[in-house]
Amino acid sequence: MSLPFPFEPRCLPTTLGSLPHTDAAQATALLLAYTPEIPAWVQLPKRTWHENMLVQYLEGLPGIVEENERAYFDTSRPGYDDALTDFFARYLAVESGDDAALETFAITPERSRGWPALLTALPKRFHPPVVAKGQVTGPFTWGTNLTDQNRRCAYYDEQLHDVIVKGVALKALWQIKHLKAFGAPVMIWMDEPALLGFGSSTFIGISREDVLRDLNEVAGAIHNAGALAGVHCEANTDWSLLMEADLDILDFDAYDHLEAITLYPDELRAFFDRGGSLGWGIVPTLNPQAAATETLESLLARFDAGVASLAARGFERKLLLRRALITPSCGAGTLTPPLAERVLGLLRELAATLRKREGFAGG
């Protein structure tokens, strides 16, 4: 792994994107206020079903049917073969540098009010962001949750599998193109909650090599466009697999699952040696009571304990802090708006406290 640009986050905060609000301008203003250095475009799943992570990126894919808040591929419909051929033709055109073809994979305002809200807000800022962040649903999560007309996982269909992996890459490339226009470096994170079940009987027949190949194909496209590639998984998974993948950022649930990272010291060391950074999901969002009761002091103590645990395994403390992003443990879209705003406040406070304490605040 060779980073597309030098990146040491030094405890800067960022978010995973989702908020429970329904007004995109208000939600975007919140993210820009609390995470101005690495803002993400906001996802608003409570505004409409179309902002659900499984359907938000479906535009431009062949054979998609949406009915009764269910989305699936129908490969039996008349015209599907032509649509499939057209999809791959547009993909090849994008690979050849055709901007018009790339625009056929746009995320429209109906699926993401937060996207145009961020693009409108960014030019009004006095300082450009350190990095602009986009996000996509990862190929494993998308492929194992979307089905065909017979409710068979798309991941197990060779053609649909290929469509999904290339679809993720195309949605990432479209975001990179538009975010780069603001003059800031770009990172794209893949959201992979379904990796929690990788290796279980639920996903029998899916190999480690399959998952690595898909992640690396998307990451390769992101890197070729000059952006950083990251993955978020909010629960326990085989982190050694993700550490082996060609990824620059791994975002984990440091609040409830810190031990998941500490199980793989050799793989983590190799990840750091390649320039990788960790997103510490230390501000809780999955447990509303924890989100309501944790304090700056309690989260600081929990974060320091996590750093100490890795330092005890031979990692240099300063390296851990230089390569740390401070994030929520998961998206905040399931919380109430006041609680989500409390999470953002804690996130900002914790990052600012760490950066001041460690001497990062000036750089």
Predicted segments with their positions:
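Surface-exposed amphipathic alpha-helices with a cationic face
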Residues: L119, P123, A172, I176, ...
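Catalytic-face loop-and-helix region of soluble metabolic enzyme cores
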Residues: D248-A361
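Acidic (Asp/Glu)-rich catalytic clusters
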Residues: L32, L118-P129, K177-G183, M243-E244, ...
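A cross-family glycoside hydrolase active-site/sugar-binding cleft signature
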Residues: W41-L44, K133-T137, W189-D191, G230-E234, ...
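Active-site-proximal beta-alpha loop/turn segments in soluble metabolic enzymes
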Residues: N145-H161, W189-I206, I282-A292, T327-T336
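Alpha/beta catalytic barrel-like cores
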Residues: M1-Y156, G276, A312, R322, ...
